[in-house]
């Protein structure tokens, strides 16, 4: 009889624990944004910026962008986390890199085939952002040397209908526009092969 009672107690405990665990997971998924400071080291909070790749082709030649995509995670992004008027790595972790098998025209810039680093210079609403193509490669994203700039070109801004949680870099209009989207902003620049 004691064995049956212990088994019943164990089964009841497991059922209760799984019910509470499911409720706990649901509560974590639907919890509102915290109102105070958030620690990166809180259990069950993954603030990673996964490595992403975006590519297009011109005349069967590939152009690939490698970047790390940060998440908003209830933070104010532009003007705070990403300050206006300061060069931004345009992602997270290592520098955002463009590798092209063909010479490109990016906005007003003539970019030779090869590997380059992309930065942006965010501006307050109403002023154009600048896309920066830099010749230095392989560095961490916060390392920037202006003397290595190939050049800067203005971008076109538009507002997204809903906030985008994770930053993305995509090719649109059959690969002829490069878009950087995050939060409620969509910054774009035309790209063509030379």
List the predicted regions and their residue ranges.
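Bacterial N-terminal signal peptides
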Residues: 11-21
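Bacterial N-terminal signal peptides that target proteins for export
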Residues: 2-12
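Preference for short coil/turn "hinge" residues that link or interrupt alpha-helices
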Residues: 13, 71, 81, 91, ...
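N-terminal targeting/docking segments
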Residues: 2, 21-26
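Primarily secretory-pathway and cell-envelope proteins
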Residues: 26-86, 123, 136-194
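Mid-length scaffold segments of soluble, non-membrane domains
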Residues: 86-138
């Amino acid at each position: 009889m004691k064995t049956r009672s212990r088994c019943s107690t164990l089964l009841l405990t497991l059922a209760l624990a799984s019910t509470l665990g499911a409720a706990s997971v649901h509560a974590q998924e639907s919890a509102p944004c915290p109102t105070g400071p958030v620690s990166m080291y809180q259990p069950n909070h993954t603030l990673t910026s996964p490595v992403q790749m975006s590519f297009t082709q011109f005349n069967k030649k590939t152009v690939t962008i490698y970047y790390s995509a940060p998440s908003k995670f209830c933070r104010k992004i532009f003007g705070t986390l990403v300050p206006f008027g300061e060069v931004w790595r345009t992602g997270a972790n290592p520098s955002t890199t463009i590798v092209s098998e063909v010479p490109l025209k990016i906005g007003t810039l003539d970019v030779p085939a090869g590997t380059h680093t992309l930065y942006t210079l965010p501006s307050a609403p109403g002023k154009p952002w600048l896309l920066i193509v830099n010749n230095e490669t392989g560095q961490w994203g916060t390392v920037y040397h202006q003397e290595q700039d190939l050049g800067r070109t203005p971008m076109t801004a538009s507002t997204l209908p809903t906030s985008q949680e994770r930053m993305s870099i995509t090719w649109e209009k059959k690969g002829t526009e490069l878009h950087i989207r995050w939060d409620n902003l969509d910054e774009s620049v035309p790209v063509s092969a030379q």
